[in-house]
A protein has these predicted regions:
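N-terminal secretory/targeting leader peptides
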Residues: 1-187
Length: 187
């Protein structure tokens, strides 16, 4: 999502300052020649408001939550995934839970929670996109499947970079790819 005009090709990101939510997105932006600026959402809003940032990677729900939508006039809709959400419990607290609570958490947590949470997140994002379209103020561009395929070598390079720099990354990447394939084939 950006406040300044980006044409249909992401090559136009070259030499632009684009907010990144983290290292993986930054690496992807850098593959287009952008200057990736890693920052939190409130800082992103401040920089967008001052016109010192050319654009940002941020999901629709984050844009709404942090009241960033008023700061943009264009949305380049890319399926870049979402930042993982973890709900953690320390071992002492876990051990104090009754067995029925543990069973309920195990039954409704993990993959089940991820699937339902992901669906809810996607639906909320789609609703925000519909609201933006109805408002008519924000120009939305959604690249075609063919355009997305042209980005695939960059995506693969970033995935390889992550796997190389992450302890046990190559094994994790194989497991992630297998899980994604399984989830996608069952939906």
């Amino acid at each position: 999502t950006t406040i300044k005009e980006i044409n249909v090709a992401l090559k136009d990101l070259k030499n632009k300052k684009i907010r990144s939510p983290g290292a993986v997105h930054a690496k992807w932006l850098e593959s287009f020649g952008a200057s990736a600026e890693t920052m939190d959402s409130p800082e992103m809003n401040e920089m967008l408001n001052r016109n010192t940032l050319d654009g940002a990677i941020q999901g629709a729900t984050g844009m709404k939550t942090y009241k960033s939508l008023a700061l943009i006039n264009q949305d380049y809709h890319l399926p870049l995934g979402v930042i993982p959400f973890l709900l953690l419990i320390n071992e002492k607290t876990w051990s104090r839970q009754p067995d029925d609570v543990k069973a309920a958490m195990l039954k409704r947590g993990g993959e089940v929670s991820a699937i339902y949470g992901g669906k809810a997140y996607e639906e909320a994002g789609q609703q925000i996109q519909q609201e933006l379209k109805a408002e008519g103020r924000v120009k939305t561009t959604t690249p075609s499947a063919a355009q997305l395929m042209t980005y695939e070598p960059r995506n693969q390079a970033v995935q390889q970079w992550w796997a190389d720099k992450t302890p046990n990354g190559k094994t994790l990447m194989v497991e992630i790819q297998a899980q994604l394939k399984s989830l996608r084939s069952s939906s």
